[in-house]
């Protein structure tokens, strides 16, 4: 299958975390290629200091996501991440980490994203700091990526900015709003898929990805 599903995301986006199991299932069952593009929603100038208002808003949304998807947002995460006003809502380091993985073992970038998400939302770890992310990458055996992240060379920052710029350009071209966003690319043509469908009608979303009938999808599954 020559199709590619481009996944527009931010590592600190709760809805992106909620979408992860469905994305993994669709990629595994259909064989569609997966390309990750970070949008920089909470990176760089998009980063925000944490305060109680933001923490409360995030936790309320997180509970909705957990109810809808079954993804865990632990009390440890609430207490150690959201209630830690010294820990900003800043995905800069996590986005750099994923670019380092994309440069060294691109086939494992989605796996690394899932592990970063779990570290934050389940384990309550601080994934806004480079040293924590370096340890996380080493724990996955992504030694080259960890080395690149630790060096934090200008080239890594430039590559990350290029990915963010590409994501933003794609979003503007297709009038995409927010993350997660999904673009199916097939033989030079690209089409924005409704991300809400992934949560409400995942099987129909899979059909949209494949461009096939329900009966054909059933045979794949």
Regions found by a protein language model. Give the residues of each.
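Structural alpha/beta surface segment adjacent to cysteine/selenocysteine redox centers
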Residues: 17-121, 220
């Amino acid at each position: 299958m020559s199709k590619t599903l481009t996944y527009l995301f931010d590592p600190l986006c709760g809805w992106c975390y909620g979408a992860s199991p469905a994305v993994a299932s669709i990629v595994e069952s259909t064989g569609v290629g997966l390309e990750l593009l970070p949008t920089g929603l909470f990176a760089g100038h998009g980063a925000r200091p944490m305060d109680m208002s933001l923490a409360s808003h995030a936790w309320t949304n997180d509970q909705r996501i957990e109810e809808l998807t079954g993804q865990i947002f632990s009390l440890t995460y609430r207490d150690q991440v959201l209630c830690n006003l010294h820990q900003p809502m800043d995905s800069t380091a996590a986005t750099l980490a994923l670019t380092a993985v994309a440069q060294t073992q691109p086939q494992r970038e989605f796996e690394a994203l899932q592990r970063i998400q779990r570290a934050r939302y389940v384990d309550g770890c601080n994934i806004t700091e480079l040293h924590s992310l370096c340890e996380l990458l080493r724990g996955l055996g992504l030694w080259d990526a960890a080395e690149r992240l630790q060096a934090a060379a200008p080239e890594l920052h430039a590559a990350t900015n290029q990915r963010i710029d590409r994501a933003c350009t794609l979003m503007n071209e297709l009038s995409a709003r927010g993350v997660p966003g999904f673009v199916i690319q097939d033989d030079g043509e690209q089409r924005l898929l409704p991300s809400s469908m992934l949560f409400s009608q995942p099987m129909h979303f899979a059909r949209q990805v494949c461009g096939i009938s329900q009966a054909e999808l059933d045979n794949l599954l």
